Amino acid sequence: DEDQVSLATAAAGISDVLRYTLTCSDADYSTMVPQAMAALTEKGYRVEKFRNAWGGKFYQGVNVHLMSPAGVRVELQFHTPQSFAVKQASHAVYEIRRNPASSAEEVEEATRLSIAYNAAVVVPEGARAIHWPVAA
């Protein structure tokens, strides 16, 4: 059937089959994220996407998509204990927001809650300035 997609093609479009979370203290966050990124790239991981979402409305943290030396896609999320707790606690409202079966009222309330949860997260000093690759 022409609508079928090969397994390899479908797998190539999935970026979070292997998802890891690295949690750092607020005090160490802005140092640890670049150190971890440097260690990964030195080991042969290729950065496909680097997103610093600190200060955003719906997610607090750094999200990275990597390709391992063996060709495996990996997602790595960098969080503080608080940002990780909020991410976990707000997952249900995230699912409501992305579900096409959710009513407009449900999406509106889920959006309001998500913004409120994320607004309460303390942004570690220097976190908004983290980027990759590091400027020379």
Report the location of each language-model feature:
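Long beta-strand-rich cores associated with HINT superfamily self-processing modules
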Residues: 5-136
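Active-site-proximal segment of RNA-dependent polymerases
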Residues: 1-2
